[in-house]
Amino acid sequence: MKYLFYNIEYSGIDLSGNRYTLFSKEAFTDKDKPELVNMKFVEANFYFKDDTILNVISKEGVYNNKTLDMEFKKDVIAKYGESKLVADKANYSNSNSFLEISENVVVTDQKGTVHADKLLFDIKKQNLNIISLNNNKINAKINLK
């Protein structure tokens, strides 16, 4: 049995002490796995301690209301400062304090554009790893001005 909801909002603080909000126009849960909230037309905002904001939108997503983990799927768009990211998938792991972006990743900002297979952002350490799979190259156009 499935339970259908409209215009839902979750908010909280992750294990690193950062605040977040999560919105969905439509969502459903399954009786057998009530902790998993399957969502459509998703928007999340992460408010970091340094006063920066990460905004993520996607056509679909899954929120685990026990672990606070989030998965974003289909037409993922993220904005962080002057940077814009597009990808097919993004996973936020609250328990491991990281954000993994994968599949057709393109990051664009004032300094240039990067195409990669996967990005791993460690929230606690505030560092980014850019990964290429299957011996693919990471394509980057960087403006050094």
Show the residue positions of the predicted features.
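Mature-chain termini and adjacent capping regions
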Residues: 1-145
